[in-house]
């Protein structure tokens, strides 16, 4: 169900001296600008393109055709979202910024380790480092796409090494059913085979920061009966 008009915010695009506005759900608009697949009908509070949303002054089909090459309001709305600015409230901007920072810090926590200990830094420590160096985070840009820039910035005060680990695992046959899908969530299976007794043997490549979590999950799934061996550590 589309957001109500009173809770929507304005997305605005100024082009060729003209202003075009739409009323949008701020959070779905953010997701759309990040590149996620969100139906435009769900983002819009109303299926109209305005010259001035506050006054209810709608853009004519002729105006839209002239500027955008189409009079379809949904297609025009997509262009406004991609190229224009979403007018967030101060609270919305603050909430989205904190959420985006935590997403980035969580990705770093999972993929990087402290080279001095081999263990990942806690998310809160990464967040403090981001704050200390004054990292600039883009609310409307995907978190994954910002990770490398953030790592470069915080490495000055927080030692980090991006690391992948390859682990050999053997899971007894009686636990394979429950473990098969869960294990694959951690990384990429590089090689697998089945032993004569039904055990599952495989090599899995996982981010360095989730190694302990991976072992804990394996132990829980197999009641401590899984066998593991670290085969390779690869710094990136």
From Swiss-Prot:
Origin superkingdom: Archaea
InterPro entries, per database record: EFG_III/V, Ribosome_mat_SBDS_CS, Ribosome_mat_SBDS_N_sf, Sdo1/SBDS, Sdo1/SBDS-like, SDO1/SBDS_C, SDO1/SBDS_central, Sdo1/SBDS_central_sf
Protein's name in the database: Ribosome maturation protein SDO1 homolog
Native source organism of the sequence: Pyrococcus abyssi (strain GE5 / Orsay)
SUPFAM superfamilies tied to this protein: EF-G C-terminal domain-like, FYSH domain, Hypothetical protein AF0491, middle domain
Intrachain disulfide bonds: none
Any Gene Ontology biological process: cytosolic ribosome assembly
Protein family (similarity comment): Belongs to the SDO1/SBDS family.
């Amino acid at each position: 169900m589309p957001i109500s008009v009173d809770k929507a915010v304005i997305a605005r695009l100024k082009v060729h001296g003209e202003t075009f506005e739409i009323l949008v759900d701020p959070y779905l608009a953010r997701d759309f600008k990040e590149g996620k697949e969100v139906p435009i009908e769900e983002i819009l509070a109303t299926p109209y393109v305005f010259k001035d949303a506050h006054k209810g002054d709608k853009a004519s089909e002729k105006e839209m055709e002239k500027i955008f090459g189409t009079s379809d309001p949904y297609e025009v709305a997509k262009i406004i979202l991609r190229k224009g600015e979403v007018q967030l409230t101060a609270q919305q901007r603050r909430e989205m910024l904190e959420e985006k920072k935590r997403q980035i810090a969580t990705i770093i926590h999972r993929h990087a380790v402290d080279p001095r200990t081999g263990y990942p830094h806690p998310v809160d420590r990464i967040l403090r480092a981001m704050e200390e160096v004054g990292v600039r985070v883009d609310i409307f840009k995907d978190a994954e796409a910002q990770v490398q820039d953030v790592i470069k910035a915080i490495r000055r005060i927080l030692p980090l090494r991006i690391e992948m680990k390859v682990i050999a695992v053997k899971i007894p046959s009686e636990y394979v059913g429950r473990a098969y899908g869960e294990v694959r969530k951690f990384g990429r299976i590089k090689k697998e085979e089945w032993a004569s007794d039904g055990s599952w043997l495989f090599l899995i490549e996982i981010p360095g920061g989730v190694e302990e979590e991976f072992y804990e999950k394996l132990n829980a799934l197999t009641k401590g009966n899984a066998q593991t061996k670290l085969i390779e550590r690869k710094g990136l």
